[in-house]
Amino acid sequence: MSLYGGIPTNLVSGMSSAGAICTTQIRDAREREKREIGLLNDRLADYIEKVRFLKAQNHVLSHDIEILRRGFSGGGHISSFFESEISNCTVISERILSSRTKFQADITGLEGEIEIYRKKWLEALKVVRSHREDHHVNLDKLAEVEAQIALFNRKIRIVEEDVLRIRRETGGIQNDIGRIHSQIHAEIALKNERHHSVQMLLQRVQVIQTENSSRIEQELIYIHRDTTLENRDYFRQELQAAMRDIRANYEAMSIRSREDIEIAYRKRIDEIRVIPAHVHIEDYREELLSIRTTLSTTHSRLAEIESRNAWLLTTITDLKHQQAEEARIFEATLDAKQATYEQFKERCTELSIQMEKLCDHETSLQAELERYRVLLNGANVTTYVSNSTGAAGYRSSTHVATTTTTTTNGYSSGYTAGGYTSGGYTTGGYTRGITAGGAVGGISTGGYIGRSSSSHGISVGGNIGGVSVGGHINGYHASGDISAAGRHHESSYSYSSSNN
């Protein structure tokens, strides 16, 4: 039941449904974004795990290379050991290539998913904006409905007042006709007097209304002409003062009218008490009580309406502030989501760059392994010495032949160096040396193989990834040195053998 004449009001506000729909969609969007962020975090964890696995594989390869560097002893069986290590490295390289293909496929799928999520995010923005427009439309409709409700309530109050007035007049007329015929002329005179006073009051009200309308129009014209802040404050203060004066005048007039009515009622009661033939005092008392009850009810209803009006104004202000706060929070949340998306995008870019670096490093490792294979093939040098011993320790002939095949950056070349020595004298010979060098994946390789005619021997030297290898071989003595120098450690290995 409403407060206006006991008539039920069943009006449903459109703002609740629109707000519920908007809140539900925002909550669904947040849940969907949380799930998508969780999936992206899982994928990022998988990528980090794969990168750590590749780092571990790289560490294993580095350890194997270090073992190969430290385990060089110059024996003839080193080739099998290198071949096994090369096969293991080939398997690991193939595994890395397969992982690379898989990672590239994952990156492609992730880019597609990122594009899909971006489209979904843009669609969500469009939906939110459309709902915001619907919300404004619903607010406009709500304002219109509330204005209509206020208009209908005012009309209802006017009708109720008319009904009460008509009932009072009808009851009074019936009582006057049935009970007091002798006071008809007095009542008619009083009625005419009251009517005349009402007409006078109406005329005064019309005059005041006309004056106020003209003043308001003049003030509006003045306001439109000059709208500075000081004039607005002055107009507001004057308006508040005028409203206070009007309220004070209204209260004074209401008090005077109430006193006049009470005086008239008292006079009427005294007149009724003076009449000896009157026997309906109880009816008048009941009527007076009903009038007082109606008056108190009207006052209480007016107080309730004023309190409800104040509550509605406060509620409207709170809703406006709440809407502004929610809009600000929503914009801040969208900015945070955009920043998170940019961070994920940067992380994906960094992962792609790391993958490219790993692929480049893998290519460098393959090139280094190929270089090791070339050096191992070059280490298989066939050297043989044929001696024919005569009388008195006479060395009749010595022949040393060296065949070397060198592959550098995909280019193969060969040479043969040999000489013939008789009786300790050099009768003829040919000496040739070659220097090969290059850089593969940050590892420098270089070597020198030649024969010195003055020392009657073969000198072999090289540099592989910071490992220096050198040696000299002749008919009586073989010596060599292997040294490795790096950024973090240094190591060397020397061997020597004599053949008497």
UniProtKB/Swiss-Prot annotation:
Annotated region described as Tail, given as residue ranges: 384-496
Keyword ATP-binding: no
Residues covered by region (Coil 2): 238-383
Claim: Coiled coil is one of the keywords in the record: yes
Pfam families linked: Filament
Keywords: Coiled coil, Cytoplasm, Intermediate filament
Region (Linker 1): 69-81
Region (Coil 1B): 82-219
Primary residence: cytoplasm
Linker 12: annotated span: 220-237
GO MF annotation, one: structural constituent of cytoskeleton
Region feature Coil 1A, mapped onto this chain: 37-68
GO biological process: heterochromatin formation; nuclear envelope organization; nuclear migration; nuclear pore localization; protein localization to nuclear envelope
Domain annotation IF rod: ranges: 33-383
Region (Head): 1-36
Cysteine pairs bridged by disulfides in the record: none
GO annotation, cellular component aspect: cytoplasm; intermediate filament; nuclear envelope; nuclear lamina
Subcellular location: Cytoplasm
Function: Cytoplasmic intermediate filaments provide mechanical strength to cells. Not essential protein.
Entry similarity comment: Belongs to the intermediate filament family.
Protein name, UniProt field: Intermediate filament protein ifc-1
Source lineage: Eukaryota, Metazoa, Ecdysozoa, Nematoda, Chromadorea
Gene that this sequence comes from: ifc-1
